[in-house]
Each structure stands twice: as C-alpha cells, then as structure tokens.
C-alpha cells in the first residue's frame, strides 16, 4: 500500500509525467534487452501499445485504391504517411472492419475443404453432450496423447512431400510419393483445390494438420482418444471434471482402436499355431483395416500397445524400450540388475525355476486404471507408491508389484498347485503362473505380507490387507498416493529381436513382451477388419469356418482338382483345412478321414465316378490324420450352431446344398460361391487346360508328329489329332472336339483317361 501511495503521489506531479512520457530511455542495458534478437520480449505489452496507436497496421499500397479514406462515421481509415522502412502504407484497425463489411466477396467454396479440421471440430462440439460437473480429486497422469483429431498417419517427411506436390506442384525439388496413402491423398487434394484463392501458405498449414499426427505429453484423467483431448480444458480441472460425450468419431481414433483389436486377435491366434512367428507375419500381411493394409498402418501408427508392439517387432520395426508385465508398462528409471536362475519352493512345496533380478532398481508402472512407483532390490520390495481410480485398480497394481518383487513371502503364499496354461495348452512361465494365481485370489498374499506403523506424510496414506485406507498402519512398504505417476515421456524407439514364440527382447536380451502380456479383452472394431488368412476364419465362430473353407475350395477349384488327382497328400496337408478340424468331433475325426480318403482313391481308380460336388463336400474331412477302419458313413457330423449337424455323403443337406442348375453352393444357407468350370487361361490346372474341348484317345501315336506343348494346342482345327505333353512328362494322343456342348464333361472323365492312357 505504501508503495502505491508513493507512486500516486509521484504521478500527481506534472514533472514526473513529463519525464516518463517525453524523455528517451538511454540506458544501454535496457535498450539491449528490448532490441536484441528477433524474439519479442513482451508480446502482450507490445500488442496493447501498438493497438493504442492510430495506424498500427501496414498494408499493401494497392489498398488505398480499394478502401475509402474515411468510413461512414468520417473516421480516417489510412494514413498518407508511409511505413518506415517499406513501401507499405499505415492503416487503422477500422480499415479491417470496413474491409470485412464492405470488401469484395470471393468464393467460399474452398473454405470447408481447407479448414476441414476446424469445420469438423465445430460439428463434433455441436453434437457433443456435456453432462454434470463433479467436484472430486483428479488423479491426472501425463500421457503422450494425440491432440489433432481427423488426421491421416503420414510421417512428417511423407506429409511434406504431399504438401509440396499439392500446393507448389511446379517447384523444383526431389519429391518421391511412394506409399499408397500419399498418392491417394495427393490426387484427392489436387482435385479439391482447383482454382483455390486461399494463400498457399495457409493451405500448407492446414494440410499439415490433416496429414500428420501431433502428440503432446499432457496430464489426463480420462479418455485419451483425440476427440476427448480436444476438449481437455472443458472436461477436467484440478478438482473438478465434466462429463462429455463427443459428437462424432474421427478416423484416426478408429484406426488406433481397430489396430489394437486386430493385433490382439492375430497374436492370440498365432500363439497357438505350429510356427507362431511365421503365422503372425502371414496374418499381418494379409489383413486389411478399413481398406488399408495392416502392415502399412503398423509402419505409420505410433500406438504403444502390447499386441501392436509384438506385430511391429515381427516386422523389424523399432518399438519403445519399456517392458510389459501383467498389463502394466514398466520403465526402469534408475539402478540396474543382473539375471540369475534360482529354484524356489511355493507354499505347496512345488519347485519353481525363476529368473531372479539381482540389484537395486526403481521403476514406474503405468496401467490403464492405476500407476505406481516401485523401488526394489534382489527379491525384496523396498517401497511401492500406488495411485488408482478405485480400490480394485489399486489392488491389481499391488498384486503385480508384489509378484514382480519375487519376495519369498509372496512365493510362500501360494496355496495349491500352479498349473496355468496358455491358449496353446502350454504351461505358462513361473512368473505368470504366480501372477495368475494371485490375480484369482490375493487374500493370503496380502495377509502374509506384513504390516508396519507409518509416518504422517502429506498426500500419502497407508493401506491394510483388506484394502481399507489407514493413517496409522499399512502393508509393509506400500503407500497410496493422491498423485498419479506420469507415463514415460520419451518417444525413443529401440531395435528389438523376436523369437519364433513371439517373445520380444531388447539388445541386452531382456524380455520386453510376450504373448502372455496380450490382453484378453474383446472389443468390437470401429473399422472393418478383413482377415484374408485362413487362420482367422474361426474368429467369427464355427459357421464362418465352414463357409470360408468351402468358399476357399471353390475359389481355388482348378488347382485343387489337379492336386486331388496327382498329389492328394499335399492337398490334405494344406493349412486352409486346419480350422475345419475343430468342427469335427474329436473321437471320430480319424475314422472320417480314413473313410473319405478311401472313397477318393476309389474315385481315382474307377473310371467315371469322379463327382465334383462330392469331392468339394468331403475334402475338408480328409485333412485329419486318417485311422484305417472298415467303417462306412452315410453322413458326417460337424459341430455348428451349438449342436452336431449332418453333411450327407450323397445328396444335399441344410449344411451343404449344391444346386446343379445354378451351380451355386450354399453352406448353412449362406452363399459360398459358384462353381465355374471355365478356368482363367494360363493359371488353370495343366490337365484341365488340356482337356477342356479335347478328347483323350489314348497313348502317344508317333504318326501325329512330335508332342506339342499345352499352349500350342489352341492352334488345332476341330477334329484334328495331336500328341501332347502333360503334367508329369507323359505324352497322350488327343483330338480337338467337333462340338462345344460336351466340353463340360471333359474335366470329369479326363483324369481317369489320362491315368488309363499312361498306364
């Protein structure tokens, strides 16, 4: 108050006012401070001071011909004085108002296209719903979040090339547009922006917003998808939150969400196949998400999720150096350890071989609903500070940390045998065995852990074995904090290796990820996921397996047919028949297979019994390892729709129905395709290509000249005979048919005739 009085007193004297307004500032240090460098030192003051002047804005000289000197109120809009140091004129802020009201109108057609991200944001907010405000403590943790909804996922470099190509197509400079997304976007934008009058620089800025993912490290207590982040300032404060439902979704969030679901499904499926790594790669390469190849998305998308990271590792991409255990992301913040195998005894006297980490280490643990700081040393937890949304989440984090600590009292708390298995029916490793055990029931673990008196520390309270909070006592070393633990901020990526069982290791050999870490959570993808791989047929249940198997046979009928006659064993071992086996009752699989294989052999041996539909119908049953038995079947059972349904060996059934006139096959009422007997030239099976339109007369006859190749056959005239070289290097005599009508039956009798002609 004294100071203010003094200042008032000074200001009342005219001399003071004169000094402050008229005299120059001539202290060198001050002049230096405010004039060195291009950076404005006090932007808000500068702005206020400038706007207080009469003509704070400079404009191109042409403006004087387009704007009157005075407005309707008689206020001067521009000065006759030139701007010092340029050939521009000085104008008043009122000139801007006049221009906005009375200036020329240009076409606005490009605005929504250029400012697309803004227009869409307005729509989302218009249709969004804001709920009540709740006052409560907010546990916010800093996470790396996407702050820019509605973007494509191009890298900065890719986007730069696209922008240059769209905005400055004639500029010189090497631009190579390689990825599919780059080409599509460039084409689309060039069309949209024809005759666009908006300044190229503005267009470039806006395109950047649309093409590149921008991330920031922000404190968040709720949803992390970009449509929530754009309203972060409206939905959460230090002590309040406001409920909000976005008024629309954006493709980038949908891609992230669908990518996670696809990756989880693929890793889970690959883990149970004979060669997990090969299967995983095959599935990643043959899957599309929202019409884009999954491998392209993986290369561009920075999502950090366990299954996604396993897929990235398999593709040889770099991933984050943190590791996963029990759904928590662990990042070592200090210390180091060496690993050593040790045998320990559980409370049930079962021996476990665990890899013990020897040495002092500190970690941050970040999960979906809880976070923690963990300090540990060899097989001992020193301190655990947890924060979480609720009691349940806090308990989950405590269990994980206790298991991770490898303490003896945790291992001794095991009651009963540990025999958890993964999806492939293999035993889990000991650490995951312990984890599963205590996740089912942690009562004994918490009771045996031990409790201690605690000091009163700001922001921290104790927690008892029954998960009630306390200010006096707590489980040994464990405290609950009001503050969350920030996610690891660095976006650094490291080179990793992956083994055939999908275990991902860093270059020091530490396991960062394994299929056990992949969440079992099921969700519904926002974008269509198309799995072309037969391994994923079962994802939509037994019916889908059935339909897909038969669709596959029909689509590939030309090659299947040749293999059926020449190399059946190879055909039976095809990976596409693997999912089907799970539909056939286990006890009878072998007998069915033996029966069908015998039936097929008879067809091959006995002329004229070749029956296309029957082969298609029974083929999947022949894929199981056959048991020899004298059993005959008139129908075969498959387990779909929760019960056994019958496929008739001869004739149609609801499961398998072939309409001879339309040549359409329906499986369980679903269309499974049409049997076309006109193969694509060149890709068709060798024999079929020979036979369609030719009659096989018998063994080679030298009188008809040297053997022709299949391609030379097309030159024969109707009724002309020739020797021809077929599949296995055998030569047979054929005659080109005189009539086309009988062509269809050729393929059915041909295989027989070839066999007879050769034998």
UniProtKB/Swiss-Prot annotation:
Picking any one GO molecular function of the record gives: RNA binding
Where is the protein localized? Virion; Host nucleus; Host mitochondrion
Short motif (Nuclear localization signal): ranges = 736-739
Q: Name one Pfam family in it.
A: Flu_PB2_7th
Q: Which GO terms describe its biological process?
A: 7-methylguanosine mRNA capping; cap snatching; DNA-templated transcription; symbiont-mediated suppression of host cytoplasmic pattern recognition receptor signaling pathway via inhibition of MAVS activity; symbiont-mediated suppression of host gene expression; symbiont-mediated suppression of host mRNA transcription via inhibition of RNA polymerase II activity; viral RNA genome replication
Q: Name one GO cellular component term.
A: host cell nucleus
Which SUPFAM superfamilies does this one have? PB2 C-terminal domain-like (SSF160453)
Sorted keywords for this record are:
Cap snatching, Eukaryotic host gene expression shutoff by virus, Eukaryotic host transcription shutoff by virus, Host gene expression shutoff by virus, Host mitochondrion, Host nucleus, Host-virus interaction, Inhibition of host innate immune response by virus, Inhibition of host MAVS by virus, Inhibition of host RLR pathway by virus, Inhibition of host RNA polymerase II by virus, mRNA capping, mRNA processing, Viral immunoevasion, Viral transcription, Virion
- Where exactly is the site Mammalian adaptation? 627
Please name the InterPro entries in this protein's record: Flu_PB2_2nd, Flu_PB2_6th, Flu_PB2_C, Flu_PB2_CAP-bd, Flu_PB2_middle, Flu_PB2_N, INV_PB2, PB2_helical
| Family of the protein in this entry | Belongs to the influenza viruses PB2 family.
What the protein does comes down to: Plays an essential role in transcription initiation and cap-stealing mechanism, in which cellular capped pre-mRNAs are used to generate primers for viral transcription. Recognizes and binds the 7-methylguanosine-containing cap of the target pre-RNA which is subsequently cleaved after 10-13 nucleotides by the viral protein PA. Plays a role in the initiation of the viral genome replication and modulates the activity of the ribonucleoprotein (RNP) complex.
Record HAMAP family: INV_PB2 (MF_04062)
Record text on subunit structure and interactions: Influenza RNA polymerase is composed of three subunits: PB1, PB2 and PA. Interacts (via N-terminus) with PB1 (via C-terminus). Interacts with nucleoprotein NP (via N-terminus). Interacts (via N-terminus) with host MAVS (via N-terminus); this interaction inhibits host innate immune response.
Q: How is this protein named in the record?
A: Polymerase basic protein 2
Q: Which organism is it from?
A: Influenza A virus (strain A/Fort Monmouth/1/1947 H1N1)
């Amino acid at each position: 108050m004294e100071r203010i009085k003094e200042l008032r007193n000074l200001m009342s004297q005219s001399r003071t006012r004169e000094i402050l307004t008229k005299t120059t500032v001539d202290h060198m240090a001050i002049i230096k401070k405010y004039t060195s460098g291009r950076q404005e030192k006090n932007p808000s003051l500068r702005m206020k001071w400038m706007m207080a002047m009469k003509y704070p804005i400079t404009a191109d000289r042409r403006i004087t011909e387009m704007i009157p000197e005075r407005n309707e109120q008689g206020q001067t809009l521009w000065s006759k004085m030139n701007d010092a140091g340029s050939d521009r004129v000085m104008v008043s802020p009122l000139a801007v108002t006049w221009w906005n009201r009375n200036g020329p109108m240009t076409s606005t057609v490009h605005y929504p296209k250029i400012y697309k991200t803004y227009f869409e944001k307005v729509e989302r907010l218009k249709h969004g719903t804001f709920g009540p405000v709740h006052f409560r403590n907010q546990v916010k943790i800093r996470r790396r979040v996407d702050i820019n909804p509605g973007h494509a996922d191009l890298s900065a470099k890719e986007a730069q090339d696209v922008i240059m190509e769209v905005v400055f197509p004639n500029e010189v400079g090497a631009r190579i547009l390689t990825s599919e997304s780059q080409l599509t976007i460039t084409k689309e934008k060039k069309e949209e922006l024809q005759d666009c009058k908006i300044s190229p620089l503005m267009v470039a800025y806006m395109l950047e917003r649309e093409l590149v993912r921008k991330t920031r490290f922000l404190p968040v207590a709720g949803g992390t998808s970009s449509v929530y982040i754009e309203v972060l300032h409206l939905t959460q404060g230090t002590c309040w939150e406001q409920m909000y439902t976005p008024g629309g979704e954006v493709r980038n969030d949908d891609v992230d969400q669908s990518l996670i679901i696809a990756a989880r499904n693929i890793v889970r499926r690959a883990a149970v196949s004979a060669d997990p790594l090969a299967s995983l790669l095959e599935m990643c390469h043959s899957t599309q998400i929202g019409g884009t190849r999954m491998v392209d998305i993986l290369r561009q998308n920075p999502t950090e999720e366990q299954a996604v990271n396993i897929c990235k590792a398999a593709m040889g991409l770099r991933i984050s150096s943190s590791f996963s255990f029990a759904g928590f992301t662990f990042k070592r913040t200090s210390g180091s350890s060496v690993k050593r195998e040790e045998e320990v005894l559980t409370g049930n006297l079962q021996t476990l071989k665990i890899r013990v980490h020897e040495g002092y280490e500190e970690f941050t643990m970040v999960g979906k609903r809880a976070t923690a700081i963990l300090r540990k040393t060899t097989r001992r937890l020193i301190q655990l500070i947890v924060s979480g949304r609720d009691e349940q989440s806090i308990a989950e984090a405590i269990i994980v940390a206790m298991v991770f600590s490898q303490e003896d009292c945790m291992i001794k708390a095991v009651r009963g045998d540990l025999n958890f298995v993964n999806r492939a029916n293999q035993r889990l490793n000991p650490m995951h065995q312990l984890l599963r055990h205590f996740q089912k029931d942690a009562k004994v673990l918490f009771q045996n852990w031990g409790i201690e008196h605690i000091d009163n520390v700001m922001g921290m309270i104790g927690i008892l074995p029954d998960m009630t909070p306390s200010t006096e006592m707590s489980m040994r070393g464990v405290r609950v904090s009001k503050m969350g633990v920030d996610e690891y901020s660095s976006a650094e990526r490291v080179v990793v290796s992956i083994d055939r069982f999908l275990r991902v290791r860093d270059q020091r050999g530490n396991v960062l990820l394994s299929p056990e870490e992949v969440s079992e959570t099921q969700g519904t993808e926002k974008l269509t996921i198309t799995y072309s791989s037969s391994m994923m047929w079962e994802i939509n249940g037994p019916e889908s397996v059935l339909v897909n198997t038969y669709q596959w046979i029909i689509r590939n009928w030309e090659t299947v047919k040749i293999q059926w006659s020449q190399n059946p064993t190879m055909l039976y071992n095809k990976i596409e028949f693997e999912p089907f086996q799970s539909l056939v009752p286990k006890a009878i699989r072998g007998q069915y297979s033996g029966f069908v294989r015998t039936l097929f052999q008879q067809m091959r041996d006995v002329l004229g019994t070749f029956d296309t539909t029957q082969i298609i119908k029974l083929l999947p049953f022949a894929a199981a390892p056959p048991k020899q038995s004298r059993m005959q079947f008139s129908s075969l059972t498959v387990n779909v729709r929760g019960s056994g349904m019958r496929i008739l060996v001869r004739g149609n059934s609801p499961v398998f129905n072939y309409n001879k006139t339309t040549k359409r096959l329906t499986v369980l009422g679903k269309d499974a395709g049409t049997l076309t007997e006109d193969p694509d030239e060149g890709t068709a099976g060798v024999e079929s290509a020979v036979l369609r339109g030719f009659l096989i007369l018998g063994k080679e006859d030298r009188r008809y000249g040297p053997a022709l190749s299949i391609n030379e056959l097309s030159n024969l005239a109707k009724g002309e005979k020739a020797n021809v070289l077929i599949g296995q290097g055998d030569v047979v005599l054929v005659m080109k048919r005189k009539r086309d009508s009988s062509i269809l039956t050729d393929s059915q009798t041909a295989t027989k005739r070839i066999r007879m002609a050769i034998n």
